Swiss-Prot record:
Substrate binds at L134, V135, S136, G137, G138, D167, G180, N272. The gene is tsaD. This is tRNA N6-adenosine threonylcarbamoyltransferase. GO terms for cellular component: cytoplasm. It holds the Pfam family TsaD. Its cofactor is Fe(2+). GO terms for biological process: tRNA threonylcarbamoyladenosine modification. Its main location: cytoplasm. Required for the formation of a threonylcarbamoyl group on adenosine at position 37 (t(6)A37) in tRNAs that read codons beginning with adenine. Is involved in the transfer of the threonylcarbamoyl moiety of threonylcarbamoyl-AMP (TC-AMP) to the N6 group of A37, together with TsaE and TsaB. TsaD likely plays a direct catalytic role in this reaction. Its EC number is 2.3.1.234. The lineage of its organism: Bacteria, Pseudomonadati, Pseudomonadota, Gammaproteobacteria, Enterobacterales. Fe cation binds at H111, H115, D300.
């Protein structure tokens, strides 16, 4: 089975073709970072217009890369939510239209399920059950996963997502958009322990998280200590250490609560080297294992949508031709898949 995946939920246009026997046959990605850089964040209308310009040419490029024609495809998967409504509608409209024209099913995919299943694209995929840490610019959640579509929310951020906190703190440090990855590189030059940030909500029971206060703490620290290069690096290090420690503490609690021995990291922030190292060390000490996708599949991409769409298509899809998206869409509302395909 070969599935075309279309990802247009935010500011990346991702197109991929996945074969259930051969794996990824094509992967095309266009990032809008330069388009939004002058605004310091994603402008929804600009994002939608750029998806309109890029989606079909990238689909054509993916077919060429895979040396396939539309007749070789068995379905089209597209991100139906959550995300920016205009951006989602571009992918949904193109996906539904092509599927109708080609005579194949169209599969709406949950963006965060795509992220959650991205580690399945690797040579050593995780087995069920596991705890999933979904950590990105828009979401930070801990999920109990006992099968595909069998998701139970354990805890989530009550304010800023971890990735959002990274970007906002980076902006306070004068770093270019998107600042999260730049902050992480700067943190490598920082002196550990010079500044100590709080670990929010770790002094109370439960698995919910909070990161908005770290931004305020960073602003106050910058104001009180100046902004020379080394001080900025030290603040970046203290901020990253606080986020990583907080996530590790909450992951440990989630594993204790569920009794699971496998941890999956997914979403853009799962590419963070410090977080990967900390959680790998923690899981080794526990006698468990941590799983994550290669860095290019941690951020938004079409491959994860194609894979998730394939799984859903094999379980049966609705033949309804209506085009609808869900900017807000709880992961727990997804129906379960009877068996892993």
């Amino acid at each position: 089975m070969r599935i075309l995946g279309i990802e247009t939920s935010c500011d990346e246009t991702g197109i991929a073709i996945y074969d259930d026997e051969k794996g990824i046959l094509a992967n095309q990605l266009y990032s809008q970072i330069k388009l939004h850089a002058d605004y310091g964040g994603v402008v929804p209308e600009l994002a939608s217009r750029d998806h309109v310009r890029k989606t079909v040419p990238l689909i054509q490029a993916a077919l060429r890369e895979a040396d396939l024609t539309p007749a070789d495809l068995d379905g089209v998967a597209y991100t139906a939510g959550p995300g920016l409504v205009g951006a989602l509608l571009v992918g949904a409209t193109v996906g539904r239209s092509l599927a109708f024209a080609w005579g194949v099913p169209a599969v709406p995919v949950h963006h965060m399920e795509g992220h959650l299943l991205a580690p399945m694209l690797e040579e050593n995929p995780p087995a069920f059950p596991f705890v999933a840490l979904l950590v990105s610019g828009g979401h930070t959640q801990l999920i109990s996963v006992t099968g595909i579509g069998e998701y139970r929310l354990l805890g989530e951020s009550i304010d800023d997502a971890a990735g959002e906190a990274f970007d906002k703190t980076a902006k306070l440090l004068g770093l270019d958009y998107p600042g999260g990855p730049v902050l992480s590189r700067m943190a490598q030059q920082g002196v550990p322990g010079r500044f100590v940030f709080p670990r929010p909500m770790t002094d109370r029971p439960g698995l919910d998280l909070s990161f908005s206060g770290l931004k305020t703490f960073a602003a106050n620290t910058i104001h009180a200590n100046g902004d020379d290069a080394q001080t900025r690096a030290d603040i970046a290090r203290a901020f990253e250490d606080a986020v990583v420690d907080t996530l590790a503490i909450k992951c440990r609690r989630a594993l204790d609560q569920t009794g699971f021995q496998r941890l999956v990291m997914a979403g853009g922030v799962s590419a963070n080297r410090a977080l990967r190292g900390r959680l790998a060390q923690m899981m080794q000490q526990r006698g468990g294992a941590v799983f994550y996708a290669r860095p290019e599949f941690c951020t938004d991409n079409g491959a994860m949508i194609a894979y998730a769409g394939m799984v859903r298509l094999k379980s049966g899809v609705d033949a309804d031709l209506s085009i609808s998206v869900r900017p807000r869409w709880p992961l727990a509302e997804l129906p379960p898949v009877a068996a892993r395909s």
